[in-house]
Design a protein with these regions (language model features):
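Single conserved hydrophobic/aromatic residue that forms the stacking wall/gate
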Residues: 1-11
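Residue-level recognition of alpha-helix boundary/capping or hinge positions
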Residues: 15-16, 33, 123-124, 160-161
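Extracellular structured ligand-interaction cores
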Residues: 18, 29, 53-55
Length: 161
């Protein structure tokens, strides 16, 4: 589409919750681009990861936005997505809504324009928080199931429209 982009940062390390950056000398726009999915099964107290509505919050210079997965609470959430690439008729829990993905479907990236949030004259501090019920979620592996939330977050600079 003619746009060139440069990746500035990636929050993939499970402990990296903030990123300090300065804006490039010339850019057209800046966006947060995130690919976030929940995986795992079995129950701990929250049964969170694959089947819970975790939220992902971003803060920068007094601004705030968040991403969430509303179909997770719908028992037919993924079944309703068959026309958009979900692989139907698998055994098990394929029809249930999930956190950020459905079986066979490409994971949709979440994109949010933060161009107006960036201060071009100083160091900026982008803060990320992954929450469940308003708090950081720490799974307890009591019954196996390897619950986890995969979060890949980038700050992307666009050089042209």
């Amino acid at each position: 589409n003619g746009r060139r982009r440069q990746r500035q940062m990636c929050i993939r390390d499970r402990y990296k919750r903030q990123h300090n950056f300065t804006a490039p000398s010339s850019y057209y726009s800046a966006k947060i681009v995130a690919t976030i999915t929940g995986h795992g099964f079995n129950q701990d107290r929250a049964n969170c990861a694959e089947f819970c509505d975790h939220e992902h919050h971003y803060y920068l210079n007094g601004y705030h936005t968040y991403e969430w997965h509303p179909i997770v609470s719908d028992n037919q959430g993924c079944e309703k997505e068959v026309d958009r690439g979900v692989v139907a008729n698998q055994y098990g829990s394929w029809p249930f809504g999930r956190a950020g993905w459905c079986a066979g479907q490409d994971v949709k990236q979440w994109v949010y324009d933060i161009t107006d949030w960036v201060d071009n004259n100083t160091t900026n501090n982008l803060i990320y928080r992954g929450l469940y019920n308003g708090q950081e979620y720490v799974p307890e592996d009591t019954n196996g199931g390897s619950r986890k939330i995969e979060a890949n977050v980038w700050l992307v600079w666009y050089n042209q429209n």
